[in-house]
Swiss-Prot record:
Compartments reported by the entry: Cytoplasm
Origin: domain of life: Bacteria
Gene Ontology terms: biological process: gluconeogenesis; glycolytic process
Oligomer status and interactors: Monomer.
UniProt protein name: Phosphoglycerate kinase
Lineage: Bacteria, Bacillati, Bacillota, Clostridia, Thermoanaerobacterales
GO cellular component, one term: cytosol
Gene: pgk
Binding positions for substrate per the UniProt entry: 21-23, 37, 60-63, 119, 152
Substrates-to-products reaction catalysed: (2R)-3-phosphoglycerate + ATP = (2R)-3-phospho-glyceroyl phosphate + ADP
GO molecular function annotations of the record: ADP binding; ATP binding; phosphoglycerate kinase activity
Length: 394
């Protein structure tokens, strides 16, 4: 990796501000329901503790709309982090206020301070230079380890790096090396599976991946725009009318490049998107006009699984059907299973694909689950991520 990491600098005795991604889901009693993002940050935090740094952590949680809201406090996170680190975590009452400043100044080597939710300040998402400067003034060194927000140019992800030496943490290093290797130098066959609702969300990814992959497997709501572009009727399925021409161009380009561009051959259909409604499977050329396509069918699952099993590199981003509804989650679950049985390098983008892998207990059977949905998408598009771009080069 071309960027400096925490290994490349001396952190002993220094106050180190680490941007982590502790945006974890909680239930109504403020119990954390999935602590994966906290656990993913531990290697960097533990390295800093063991190397006698004074650790100051900054994160967002949810969307509190730029003002203080106790519902979005990071206090439950401090408690969980303390359990995982087996040591106290000091909680600041604010981000750049008096309490944060006093506690940051008083930190001893090996101690950990968690600042309150950085999005309690509207200046965070505006990347306000004054706010970034105040935040930077708490520390001597800045570490970005929040891949999940690396595609956002916010004060705590990009702004502070203007005022302090700035390096990557181990999680960002891991994300970049595994995904970077897959894109730059993949073992072949290289297969990408793209799902989700809209073609428009994935145009950049498809365009970039067509230059690199051997097979591209399409599922989810976006498949129906391609199916329509091939001249089939799609009933009441999701359609982006204004993207039909583009879908034709993409398929033509895949053909020219010799990419195996696969669309569903059968589909699960239902009259409405809710649990408990009758549903059936039809071939793709037999869609009734009053039904909605909600998932890939069994023949498609079989075809896609075969391609995945023989792949040496697989990247998956986006569900194959309406994953929130159990009856229409079969396709997504089957793809997750095929990935878990693939012997090659398997990379899962964040969001629903990651949730499917986690729920089914396949997390340790894939090479890498990205911690950032949006960030991993933009990385797959070949875009520059501002939170990484701004870090110091080696």
């Amino acid at each position: 990796m071309k960027k400096k990491t925490v290994r490349d600098i001396d952190v002993s005795g220094k106050r180190v501000l680490v941007r982590v991604d502790f945006n974890v889901p909680m239930d109504e009693n403020k119990n954390i329901t999935d602590d994966r993002r906290i656990r993913e940050a531990l290697p960097t935090i533990e390295y800093l503790i063991n190397h006698n740094a004074k650790v100051i952590l900054v994160s967002h949680l949810g969307r509190p709309k730029g003002k203080f809201n106790p519902d979005y406090s990071l206090k439950p996170v401090a408690k969980r982090l303390s359990e995982l680190l087996k040591k106290p975590v000091i909680m600041a009452e604010d981000v750049i206020g008096e309490d944060a400043k006093v506690k940051a100044a008083a930190l001893k080597e090996g101690e950990v301070l968690l600042l309150e939710n950085v999005r309690f300040h509207a200046e965070e998402e505006k990347n306000d230079p004054e706010f970034a400067k105040e935040l930077a003034s708490l520390a001597d060194i800045y570490v970005n380890d929040a891949f999940g927000t690396a595609h956002r140019a916010h004060a705590s992800t990009a702004g502070v790096a203007k005022y302090l030496p700035a390096v990557a943490g181990f999680l960002i290093e891991k994300e970049l090396s595994i995904m970077g290797e897959a894109l730059e130098n993949p073992k072949r066959p290289f297969v990408a599976i793209l799902g989700g609702a809209k073609v428009s969300d994935k145009i950049g990814v498809i365009t970039n991946l067509l230059e690199k992959v051997d097979s591209l497997l399409i599922g989810g709501g976006m498949a129906y725009t391609f199916i329509k572009a091939k001249g089939y009727e799609i009933g009441k399925s999701l359609l982006e009318e204004d993207k039909i021409e583009l879908a034709k161009e993409i398929m033509e380009k895949a053909k020219q490049k010799g990419v195996n561009f696969m669309l569903p051959v059968d589909t699960v259909i239902a009259k409405e998107l809710k649990s408990g409604v009758p549903y059936e499977v039809v071939d793709i050329d037999k869609m009734p006009e009053d039904q909605i396509g909600v998932d890939i069918g069994p023949k498609t699952i079989e075809e896609y699984s075969k391609v995945i099993k023989h792949a040496m590199t697989v990247v998956w981003n986006g569900p194959m059907g309406v994953f929130e509804i159990p009856e229409f989650a079969k396709g997504t679950k089957a793809i997750a299973k095929a990935l878990s049985e693939c012997k090659g390098t398997t990379i899962v983008g964040g969001g629903d694909s990651a949730a499917a892998i986690e729920q089914l207990g396949y997390a340790d059977k894939v090479t890498h689950i990205s911690t950032g949905g949006g960030a991993s998408l933009e990385f797959l598009e070949g875009k520059v991520l501002p939170g990484i771009d701004i870090l110091n080069d080696k």
